[in-house]
């Protein structure tokens, strides 16, 4: 009876073991499935899930262990007569416990492996989801990379800044040196090439001094070069000529000299030792100048001392165009007018005036001369003179007709011509005064 009972107990215990093993396998399988699903969907919470799962597994392990102990105690109470069976049952329970411990360790290993798989699945199993949202993920990744690149920029150290500064300075030095070398090379090529030889000399502003004389003073030769030609020496040599007032010389690359001459005007010809010499605007007589070009200069006669200086000043204030109308200036004082002068013009008129006002009044002479009536040959129909000493008036000469008569008819005719000439000249002077007032 005892043997049958022990056999039944062993069979029941084996069945219980099988059920327990099946239960544990099912539970472990379910747990692994849950872990895998959780690992795929909640990969960001792996550490928390692993800790919670470990606690959960530990609780199940303790529950199973308590259950086995209680079952073993009940069997010990039912079969108190058989200590051998109890020992076998204890051994079996111990072995079951050891098996449970082994399974628990194996499950924990599986759990760790599943966690590793979950981590790997984060990169591999989530690929389909990542492929479905490539555009959004790529945008976020690029933004993160840009931010990381910006944040990863580290400030330069002092030594690095010095290195950067040295490199920049070296680049600047190299560029400056290359520019200087090229510039020096160009200058050397120009200096020793035919381009540097003076090939053209342009002279402007010379009316009385001949061009050949200016070229002789400049001293330009066939082998003269631009960089050896001294402008200062040439200017000083040219200004020694009394006719030349000032000189400007400009070098125009590659091989041209521009010479601008400003001359002292010849305002009159003065008799000196039986010869008429040019008188300059600065009051100097031009002696020993046979090659001077004298175009149209009035002849001064009878002036001395301060009156000569005043007349020179008056002529210098006139324009060259007005001076060309004057053929001769004579000092002709009267009792009441010590500054009275007489001018004889190139168009056959005589002008009476005063030294102090003659320069202002003579600027209207071209218009006055054109207003007078002339014949086909250009001579005045009514010969006479213009009085500019006080105001301005035209006074015909008496007896200017072809037949001189003592009758009253001829006297009346002469007076009528004189009045007509005065009216014509006065109308011209009035027009001139109006134009001058408008211009002012």
Swiss-Prot record:
Q: Please give the GO cellular component terms listed in this UniProt entry.
A: cell division site; plasma membrane
> Where, by residue number, does the polypeptide cross the bilayer?
175-195
Listed A to Z, the keywords are:
Cell cycle, Cell division, Cell membrane, Membrane, Transmembrane, Transmembrane helix
Q: Output the InterPro entries linked to this UniProt entry.
A: Cell_div_FtsQ/DivIB_C, DivIB, FtsQ_DivIB, POTRA, POTRA_FtsQ_type
Comp. bias intervals (Polar residues) = 124-134, 427-440
* Record GO biological process: FtsZ-dependent cytokinesis
The record's annotation in PANTHER family points to: CELL DIVISION PROTEIN DIVIB (PTHR37820), CELL DIVISION PROTEIN FTSQ (PTHR37820:SF1)
Membrane protein topology class: Single-pass type II membrane protein
Record the organism.
Staphylococcus aureus (strain MRSA252)
Record's compositionally biased regions (Basic and acidic residues)? 1-10, 406-425
The entry's function note states:
Cell division protein that may be involved in stabilizing or promoting the assembly of the division complex.
Compositionally biased residues, Acidic residues: 12-21, 88-97
Q: Start and end of every POTRA domain?
A: 196-264
Q: Which domain of life is it from?
A: Bacteria
Q: Which residues lie on this side of the membrane: Extracellular?
A: 196-440
Q: What is this protein called?
A: Cell division protein DivIB
Q: Which residues lie on this side of the membrane: Cytoplasmic?
A: 1-174
């Amino acid at each position: 009876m005892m043997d049958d009972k022990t056999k039944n107990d062993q069979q029941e215990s084996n069945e219980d073991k099988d059920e327990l093993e099946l239960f544990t396998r099912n539970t472990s399988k379910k747990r692994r499935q849950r872990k895998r699903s959780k690992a795929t969907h909640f990969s960001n919470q792996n550490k928390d899930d692993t800790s919670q799962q470990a606690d959960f597994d530990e609780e199940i392990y303790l529950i199973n262990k308590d259950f086995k102990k209680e079952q073993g105690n009940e069997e010990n109470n039912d079969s108190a007569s058989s200590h051998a069976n109890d020992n076998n049952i204890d051994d079996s329970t111990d072995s079951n416990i050891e098996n449970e411990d082994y399974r628990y360790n194996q499950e924990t290993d599986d759990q760790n492996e599943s966690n590793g798989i979950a981590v790997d699945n984060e990169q591999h199993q989530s690929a389909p989801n990542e492929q479905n949202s490539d555009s959004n993920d790529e945008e976020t990744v690029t933004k993160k990379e840009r931010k990381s690149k910006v944040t990863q920029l580290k400030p330069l150290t002092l030594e690095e800044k010095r290195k950067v500064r040295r490199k920049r300075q070296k680049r600047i030095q190299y560029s400056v040196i290359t520019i200087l070398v090229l510039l020096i090379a160009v200058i050397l090529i120009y200096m020793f090439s035919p381009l540097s030889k003076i090939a053209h000399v342009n002279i402007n502003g010379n009316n009385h001094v001949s061009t050949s004389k200016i070229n002789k003073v400049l001293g330009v030769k066939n082998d003269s070069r631009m960089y050896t030609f001294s402008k200062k020496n040439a200017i000083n040599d040219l200004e020694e000529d009394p006719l030349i007032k000032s000189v400007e010389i400009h070098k125009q690359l590659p091989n041209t000299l521009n010479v601008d001459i400003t001359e002292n005007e010849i305002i009159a010809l003065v008799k000196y030792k039986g010869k008429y010499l040019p008188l300059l605007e600065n009051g100097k007589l031009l002696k020993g100048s046979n090659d001077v070009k004298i175009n149209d200069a009035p002849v001064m006669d009878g002036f001395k001392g301060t009156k000569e200086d005043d007349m020179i000043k008056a002529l210098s204030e006139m324009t060259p165009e007005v001076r060309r109308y004057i053929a001769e200036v004579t000092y002709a004082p009267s009792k009441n007018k010590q500054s009275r002068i007489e001018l004889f013009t190139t168009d056959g008129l005589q002008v009476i005036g005063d030294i102090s006002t003659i320069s202002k009044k003579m600027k209207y002479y071209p218009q006055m001369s054109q207003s007078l009536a002339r014949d086909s040959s250009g001579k005045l129909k009514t010969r006479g003179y213009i009085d500019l000493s006080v105001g301005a008036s035209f006074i015909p000469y008496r007896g200017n007709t072809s037949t001189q008569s003592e009758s009253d008819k001829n006297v009346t005719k002469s007076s009528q011509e004189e009045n007509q000439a005065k009216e014509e000249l006065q109308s011209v002077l009035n027009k001139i005064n109006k134009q001058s007032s408008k211009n002012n």
